[in-house]
A protein has these predicted regions:
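PLP-dependent class I/II
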Residues: 2-5, 10-11, 23-26, 31, ...
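Short beta-strand to alpha-helix junction loop
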Residues: 65-66
Length: 378
């Protein structure tokens, strides 16, 4: 008789986002406003570095944490943004997903708790549970997707090990304001917990005054882990490249998890990664900015309430007025209007849908038209 597999993994469900996209892919002509992936190709100057690396046979094992020159470049790049980490405090990872996995693998013991402000990317909960820890959810909807300090304190227990924040946020596109960041800092300092910053959208910001947690609260660097990615700012989702930074005692433990999870990132992508850091993502940002404006105007015309996103490439409008669950709404939209959106329950917040505007202008406009027509029938 076969023995059971890992019971923690048995509790996990496949990605709801991927499930919706798979359903959409089965329908010819369906427009997917669901997956958070830039619709641009990787800039040629970045891709050229991989071609050159392969031509010269750069296909051997690199250092586990990434080549020193690249880690120096990442350190300088973060320094330009006001985040101070030495090259030895940086690890190149197989995307932000592996960075999160290595971080929580190194950080969590069975029974530990991680606070996850919702709505949130479902990956956080999955990684926490896979490491035999517990996800504790903090509902931010009542505070317009900001952090209420009293509500946060109510989530803290003797078992709390960390809080994970994502700003700009997936799925709302909202940015945590100074009061929210300060609330997290006060609670983290008093409780001694770690702050894991998923900063993968930090180059996709449409407003002035954006601050990152590690930038605003350098006094907590010993408790802070910063995670970044090449995927979103440089349209490199398929490359699976990211990095993380943390103080020396913390990065030393994460490095062990990283080594035994993947050994290293891909050798022949490292020069391309260094080159990417010099490429200005502003042209893509401006396209997203224009699309965001059109999306907000369209949602307003549909009488859908939405907290205006200040970053990333998502909106998270409310659909509570229709009396449908977010899952039912999205399945109905696929079947009746041939447009795919992501249910809010995938992010721990019912009564909303996530609409991504990282698609071609033509598809975006047609998708919005289909959504408008669909809503008029409800």
């Amino acid at each position: 008789m076969r023995l059971p597999m890992n019971t923690s993994l048995a509790m996990l469900k496949p990605s709801g986002i991927r499930r919706i996209n798979a359903l959409a892919a089965q329908r010819p002509g369906c427009i997917a406003l669901a997956l958070g992936e830039p619709d641009f190709p990787t800039p040629d100057v970045i891709s050229a570095e991989v071609i050159a690396a392969l031509d010269r046979g750069d296909t051997h094992y690199p250092p586990n944490n990434g080549r020193p020159a690249l880690r120096e470049a990442l350190s300088a790049y973060m320094g330009d943004a006001g985040l101070t980490f030495s090259a030895d405090e940086v690890i190149l990872t197989d995307g932000a997903t592996e960075a999160l996995s290595a971080t929580f693998m190194a950080m969590l013991n069975p029974g530990d708790e991680v606070i996850i402000p919702t709505p949130a990317f479902g990956l956080y909960e999955s990684i926490v549970v896979a490491n035999h820890a517990k996800a504790v959810f903090l509902d931010t909807e009542p505070a317009q997707f900001q952090i209420d300090e009293d509500a946060l304190r109510a989530c803290v227990t003797p078992a709390t090990k960390a809080i994970v924040i994502c700003t700009p946020n997936n799925p709302t596109g909202c940015i945590l304001n100074a009061a929210s960041l300060d609330a997290v800092a006060r609670v983290a300092e008093q409780a001694g917990i770690y702050v894991v910053c998923d900063d993968v959208y930090n180059r996709l910001v449409y407003v002035d005054g954006y601050e990152r947690f590690a930038q605003r609260h350098p006094e907590l660097r010993e408790q802070t882990v910063v995670i970044e990615s090449f995927s979103k700012p440089w349209a490199m989702t398929g490359w699976r490249l990211g990095w993380l930074a943390a103080a020396t005692p913390v990065i030393a433990e994460i490095a062990k998890a990283h080594q035994y999870l993947v050994s290293s990132a891909v050798s022949f992508e490292m020069d391309a990664a260094t080159r990417a850091l010099t490429v200005d993502p502003t042209p893509m940002l401006e396209v997203y900015r224009a699309r965001r404006k059109r999306v907000l105007a369209a949602l307003s015309a549909m009488d859908l309430d939405v907290v205006e996103p200040a970053g990333a490439f998502y909106t998270f409008p409310s659909i509570k007025q229709f009396g449908l669950t977010s899952e039912d709404f999205c399945i109905k939209a696929i079947k009746e209007a041939n447009v795919a959106l992501v249910p809010g329950n995938c992010f721990g917040t019912e009564g909303h849908i996530r609409l991504s505007y990282c698609v071609s202008d033509q598809d975006l406009d047609e998708g919005l038209n289909r959504l408008s027509t669909f809503i008029s029938t409800l």
